[in-house]
């Protein structure tokens, strides 16, 4: 290394929470790689900068954060030059408390200010005091971030930030702000950039992604349905997913896209939270169970082979046995494939936190176990029905458990492993005969692939 070269610094990022946080962490990595020539490491003990990207959805998020920070405090003692930063939704909500309880933390930043990390690091180096920036500067961060580097055949693309629904249980509007959509040209530029790097599948992200209303160059407003048609026309992009959606924003135009755009996958994650109208009203969800079911049935009419997944909150204040049974009926009726389900925990500052909650914890745990068992049974039934089918999968790499097998995903998000020793198939589509259904994956045999001359 010459005397003029700057030594490479190492960056460790710990990510909690949703896919938006995963996306943000990847962008931090790109950003600091460009601004400070940093490279990622999986070992915090060798890092020059440690960042934790936090999530405040679940209870005890704060305590988990301080537990993690406590482990890194010793690293700071060993290396006073180490920079420790806290980002994400807990930082946005609890910035002052973090600075007070963990004075060894150098940077505190929210989801909307991560693009200012390089400047924050320089400020810290120059004046030595903790730098806190948890403001909500609209959509500015996307203007300041470098184009992303692809990591594999699939990529997340954030198309909007925040949520304006203010469900009574949810902290997101307070930590990520109101809904703000990226301009269409910005989204398209990122998708095209990823496609040129070999990305075949994009997953469009937003806390309430189907509320997307992006400005086009001519001043018109483009919704998610129209944006999907634009992205489907990008050369190289063959699969499109989006998450997370809100039932109220699931428009007729978006339902119709399932009939028009084959690149849109046959899998939809649409959180409902409860199958009880009474609980939905208390949650301020803005729709009934019947309205929710009607939308799913219309989507299934356009795409008969589609699979559905959802979110469920068990033990919301006032939930009765009848409310829970209504949720179980909805799960049966809609044949949900997978779910994110958990016991309600009050989030500070939300309206539901003030509601009386007299349901015993043991009852909540029993209900959650029953719900998760039902979903697992339904998922296995769907997997077994796929045995004997030839499924088109996007090959993403080698199987984690068996390097002699390649692995990929079906349209309905099933992991498929199959025996193949040709690494050229990674990043390509393949047709695989499904031969066995396992609890968390499928196993099959390669029938054909894009590498074949007669592929179609």
Curated annotation (Swiss-Prot):
Cofactor note from UniProt? Binds 2 [4Fe-4S] clusters. One cluster is coordinated with 3 cysteines and an exchangeable S-adenosyl-L-methionine.
Self-association or partners: how does it assemble? Monomer.
The protein, known as: tRNA-2-methylthio-N(6)-dimethylallyladenosine synthase
Can you supply one Gene Ontology CC term for this chain's record?
cytosol
What are the names of the required cofactors?
Answer: [4Fe-4S] cluster
What role is this protein assigned? Catalyzes the methylthiolation of N6-(dimethylallyl)adenosine (i(6)A), leading to the formation of 2-methylthio-N6-(dimethylallyl)adenosine (ms(2)i(6)A) at position 37 in tRNAs that read codons beginning with uridine.
Keywords of the record, alphabetical order, are: 4Fe-4S, Cytoplasm, Iron, Iron-sulfur, Metal-binding, S-adenosyl-L-methionine, Transferase, tRNA processing
Q: Which PANTHER family match?
A: CDK5 REGULATORY SUBUNIT-ASSOCIATED PROTEIN 1, MITOCHONDRIAL TRNA METHYLTHIOTRANSFERASE CDK5RAP1
Going by the entry's taxonomy, the superkingdom of the source organism is recorded as Bacteria
Q: What residues does [4Fe-4S] cluster 2 bind to?
A: 163, 167, 170
Q: Where is the TRAM domain?
A: 384-448
GO terms assigned for molecular function:
4 iron, 4 sulfur cluster binding; metal ion binding; N6-isopentenyladenosine methylthiotransferase activity
Question: What is the enzyme's class at the highest EC level?
Answer: transferase
This entry's Enzyme Commission designation comes to: 2.8.4.3
Organism of origin is: Cellvibrio japonicus (strain Ueda107)
């Amino acid at each position: 290394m010459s005397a003029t070269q700057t030594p490479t610094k190492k960056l460790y990022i710990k990510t909690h929470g949703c896919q938006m946080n995963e996306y943000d962490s990847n962008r931090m990595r790109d950003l600091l790689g460009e601004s400070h020539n940093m490279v990622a490491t999986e070992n915090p003990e060798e890092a020059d900068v440690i960042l934790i990207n936090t999530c405040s959805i679940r209870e005890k998020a704060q305590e988990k954060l301080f537990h993690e920070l406590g482990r890194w405090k010793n690293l700071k003692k060993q290396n006073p030059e180490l920079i420790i930063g806290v980002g994400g939704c807990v930082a946005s909500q609890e910035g002052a408390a973090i600075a007070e309880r963990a004075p060894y933390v150098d940077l505190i930043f929210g989801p909307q200010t991560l693009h200012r990390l390089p400047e924050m690091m320089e400020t810290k180096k120059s004046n030595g005091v903790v730098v806190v920036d948890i403001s909500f500067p609209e959509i500015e961060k996307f203007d300041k971030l470098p184009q992303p580097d692809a990591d594999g055949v699939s990529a997340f693309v954030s198309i909007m930030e925040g949520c304006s629904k203010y469900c009574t249980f949810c902290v997101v509007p307070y930590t990520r702000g109101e809904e703000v959509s990226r301009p269409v040209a910005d989204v398209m530029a990122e998708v095209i950039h990823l496609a040129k790097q070999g990305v075949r599948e994009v997953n469009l992200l937003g806390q309430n992604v189907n509320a997307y209303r992006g400005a086009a160059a001519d001043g018109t407003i483009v919704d998610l349905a129209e944006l999907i048609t634009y992205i489907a026309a990008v050369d190289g992009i063959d699969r499109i997913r989006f998450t997370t959606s809100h039932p109220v924003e699931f428009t007729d135009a978006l339902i119709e896209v399932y009939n028009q755009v084959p690149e849109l996958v046959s899998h939809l994650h649409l959180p409902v939270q409860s199958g009880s109208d009474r609980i939905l009203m208390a949650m301020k969800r803005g729709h009934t169970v019947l309205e929710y079911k009607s939308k799913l049935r219309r989507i299934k009419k356009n795409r008969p082979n589609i699979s559905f997944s959802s979110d469920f909150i068990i033990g919301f204040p006032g939930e009765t046995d009848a409310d829970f049974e209504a949720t179980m009926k909805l799960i049966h009726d809609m044949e949900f494939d997978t779910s994110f389900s958990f016991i309600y925990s009050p989030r500070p500052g939300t309206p539901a936190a003030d509601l009386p909650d007299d349901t015993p914890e043991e009852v909540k745990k029993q209900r959650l176990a029953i719900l998760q068992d039902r979903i697992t049974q339904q998922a296995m039934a769907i997997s077994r029905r796929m045995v004997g089918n030839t499924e088109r999968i996007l090959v993403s790499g080698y199987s984690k458990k068996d390097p002699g097998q390649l692995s990929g995903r079906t349209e309905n998000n099933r992991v498929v492993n199959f025996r193949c020793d040709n690494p050229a198939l990674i990043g390509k589509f393949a047709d695989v005969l499904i031969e066995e259904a396992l609890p968390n994956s499928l196993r099959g045999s390669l029938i054909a692939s894009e590498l074949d001359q007669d592929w179609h």
